[in-house]
Amino acid sequence: MRRQLVLGVLLAMGMVSIGTAAWQAGPAPRVVEVDQIKDNLYMMRNGGGNSAVFIMADGVTVVDTKNPGWGAPLLEKIKSVTGKPIVRIINTHTHGDHVSGNVEFPATVEVVTHENTAKNMQEMKSPTGITPAPDAPVNIFKDNNGKGLPRRTFKDKMSIGKGADQIDLYYFGRGHTNGDAWVVFRALGVMHAGDIFSGKNIPLLDAVNGGSGVLIGDTLAKAAKDVKNVDRIITGHSTVMTVADLEEYAAFNTDFKNTVQAGKKAGQTVDQIAAAYKIPERFKGYAAPPEARLKNNVQIVWDETK
């Protein structure tokens, strides 16, 4: 009996210790990881979409600023690679995991986006198929009196800077959203694609913010064809890839569109098309699609197909 009593006390103490340790630990630390892509260009991972940090003669341009609360850790990591001031943010599109950190940067920093993204960021509508976390801000920019919103926009193409510091911005059409910007660091031959090329997977098609399942394949193919002298591509959430990977991804999305349209023409329902879909063998290695996203994408292509 005495042995059982002692054991019970020890177990209780252990549970209290575990609970106390868990309470003391608090939320996980926000750690930004850094990869040097080329001499003055870095990719910074975790906390949302991949950020690019481009060190220029007169300061730093940052592409995408991650989730709420990740702006400060991103700023600290940038300080570890350069002491130059941040002069510009370029947001590839409107989603919160790419733009929310804007509000944690100095108010003097210029924010640049495609003109459609600027409109989308005024409203910050939840993307198609995504349920916001209970503690997520409804509109982080309204909560911060408009701080972090774009001051400069472009329509089809814009160049910023010259020579080694030149950045070219392109818009090739609807895809992930209706404002996906392609950011080219011209002298380095590197492009940041944002989430229109998030990785080798089924994309998130955000019809709420103007995305298109019918057009995304053509948009990707146009980017692969029209942007010259690029050999590396920073993806939205995956590893650095190549133009050949981008061409393959364009074909993957076109194949998906064709599959859905053929199913609709044959009289199949959205549920039937989604249930039957498998990643084609020629795209072996692509991530298996989550069921909800697959059905959302089938629905979007279905609705766009008349």
Please place each PLM-identified region on the residue numbering.
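Accessory terminal helices/loops
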Residues: L10-A25, K225-V230, T239-K306
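Metallo-beta-lactamase
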Residues: G59-T61, N67-G69, S159, Q166-D255, ...
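Short, hydrophobic/aromatic-rich segments at coil-to-beta transitions
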Residues: K38-Y42, A164-L169
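Extracytoplasmic/secreted envelope proteins and their assembly/folding machinery
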Residues: K38, S51, G71-L75, N102, ...
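Active-site HxH/HxHxD metal-binding segment of metal-dependent hydrolases
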Residues: K79-S159, N178
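Conserved beta-strand hairpin/beta-sheet module of binuclear metal-dependent hydrolase folds
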Residues: V32-K77, A181-F185, G189-D195
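Divalent metal-coordination and catalytic microenvironments
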Residues: N40, F54, D64, I78, ...
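Bacterial N-terminal signal peptides that target proteins for export
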Residues: M1-L10
